[in-house]
UniProtKB/Swiss-Prot annotation:
This is Terpene synthase 2. Its EC number is 4.2.3.-, 4.2.3.47. InterPro entries: Isoprenoid_synthase_dom_sf, Terpene_cyclase-like_2. Belongs to the terpene synthase family. A motif (NDxxSxxxD/E motif) lies at residues 219-227. It comes from the Eukaryota. Keywords: Lyase, Metal-binding. The keyword Metal-binding applies. It comes from Dictyostelium purpureum. Pfam families: Terpene_syn_C_2. It catalyses: (2E,6E)-farnesyl diphosphate = (E)-beta-farnesene + diphosphate; (2E,6E)-farnesyl diphosphate = (1S,2S,4R)-beta-elemene + diphosphate. GO terms for biological process: terpene biosynthetic process.
């Protein structure tokens, strides 16, 4: 059984060459060592972090080095936070406490009682985002809203019963973690030339939703072997739709592709109409391009990272994503 990710429709014009410089990862890694997030002897932890952060130039191919470092801190924080909670093995009350303590850090800018090393890193990251925001407190608040919304979306899908697809997409568009990326892009690319009414415009909200859902559908396909091995298949639509609908993996994948392609068409439709609503098009177009780069970056990066690589994957591209770190990051079924 060999499926191909080429069945997803990704517009060619969205494909922008990413920055060919991963030196920012070392800076992020050194900060993680300095804050006792990782131990220097932890080769697997280093490999997991490295391959997670290589997505940053794909998501943000046009940013400065300092912005790339901040994006690296975001991805590092996402994997630290999500890996603890995105499992059926942690009790809900314990997960809720972690979420509430993290929300306090983002809202108040202070540490909770007896903070963990990860919580100390969360505060450091939050303050770095505030610093990057400069005088754009509105964009910092938008980032906070998107990020807090995400952390509260993790537990609802951390269950053992397959959800209805509509309910899954409603929660998954938050749960997949794209909204914090969008929030950071708003800090990077928003300026005084963008009409602030944009961020309350229903079309902007629909564009963000489409970006998140398309990325989630890509993610569930490329991470299929990794998540099934990690007993997280119940939250993977490629897995649970087969079980729920008694369909083959081929037919299930076809359905997911059709869903993704539908949302991309919806994105293009809303983009065109949104650009026609505003006078100063170029700054807005730059911001909207950043949403495309998230979808496009996830698609192409996923085929070349050890984070998902597995000979057991049903997808040819993931089977062939060979890396020296494949032995450390074992996704075999």
């Amino acid at each position: 059984m060999n499926l191909t990710l080429k069945d997803f429709h990704v517009p060619n014009e969205w494909n922008v060459k990413s920055i060919n410089d991963n030196s920012f990862i070392q800076e992020c890694y050194q900060k993680a060592i300095e804050m006792n997030i990782y131990d220097k002897s932890d080769e697997k932890g280093k490999a997991v972090m490295y391959h997670a952060l290589t997505v940053c130039p794909a998501f943000w191919p046009t940013v400065t080095y300092d912005q790339l470092v901040l994006s690296g801190y975001l991805m590092l924080w996402l994997i630290l936070f999500d890996d603890d909670l995105d499992t059926v093995f942690i009790p809900d009350d314990e997960a809720t406490e972690i979420i509430n303590r993290t929300e306090l850090i983002f809202l108040e800018g202070i540490l909770p009682t007896n903070p963990t090393k990860k919580e100390e890193f969360t505060l450091f990251f939050r303050n770095q985002v505030l610093k990057m925001s400069g005088n754009r407190l509105d964009m910092f608040n938008l980032f906070l809203n998107y990020t807090i919304q995400w952390i509260h979306s993790i537990i609802p899908l951390n269950k053992t019963i397959e959800p209805h697809m509509d309910l899954f997409l409603f929660i998954r568009k938050l749960n997949v973690g794209v909204y914090p990326l969008i929030g950071l892009s708003c800090i990077f690319f928003s300026n005084d030339k963008i009409d602030q009414s944009l961020f309350l415009n229903p079309r902007w909200l629909k564009l963000c939703e489409a970006t998140s859902i398309v990325t989630a559908l890509y993610n569930d396909c490329v991470s299929y072997a990794k998540e099934v091995k990690g007993n997280a298949g119940v939250n993977n639509c490629l897995w649970f739709l087969q079980k729920k609908n008694n369909t083959s993996i081929q037919d299930t994948f076809k359905y997911i592709c059709e869903k993704s392609n539908m949302y991309i068409k919806e994105f293009q439709n809303h983009e065109e109409k949104l650009l026609n609503q505003y006078n100063n098009i170029q700054p807005l177009a730059t911001l909207l391009n950043s949403l495309k780069y998230i979808m496009n970056g996830k698609y192409y990066w996923s085929m070349n990272t050890a984070r998902y690589a597995s000979p057991s994957s049903p997808f040819i591209e993931i089977q062939n994503a060979v890396s020296p770190d494949n032995k450390l990051i074992n996704n075999e079924l």
